Amino acid sequence: LPSQHLCGSHLVEALYFVCGPKGFYYLPKAXXFVDSLAGYSKHQNGGISGIVEHCCHNTCSLFDLEGYCN
């Protein structure tokens, strides 16, 4: 599937689809490490703003969503 804008309930449904029984959280695992290497943290304010910025304001793929699974 191509990258797409996912917002609101569509984003939550996509996360349930991709993550299944593992569940999910809103801050990707690699973000803190990658951002610390870059010398800043985009997700300083935490949680949900990261995935909304990534997948709703911009586009993300199913592969991107996997980064938010537990």
UniProtKB/Swiss-Prot annotation:
Entry keyword set: Carbohydrate metabolism, Disulfide bond, Glucose metabolism, Hormone, Secreted
Coiled coil: none
Localization, UniProt: Secreted
Pfam families tied to this protein: Insulin (PF00049)
Domain of life of the native organism: Eukaryota
Main localization category: secreted
This protein's GO CC annotations: extracellular space
Cystine pairings recorded for this chain: 7-56, 19-69, 55-60
Gene Ontology molecular function, alphabetical: hormone activity
Gene Ontology biological process terms, A to Z: glucose metabolic process
Propiece residues: 33-49
Gene3D superfamilies xref list: Insulin-like
Similarity remark: Belongs to the insulin family.
Role this protein plays: Insulin decreases blood glucose concentration. It increases cell permeability to monosaccharides, amino acids and fatty acids. It accelerates glycolysis, the pentose phosphate cycle, and glycogen synthesis in liver.
SUBUNIT field: Heterodimer of a B chain and an A chain linked by two disulfide bonds.
Name assigned to this protein: Insulin
Gene source species: Torpedo marmorata
Taxonomic lineage from the root: Eukaryota, Metazoa, Chordata, Craniata, Vertebrata
Gene that encodes it: ins
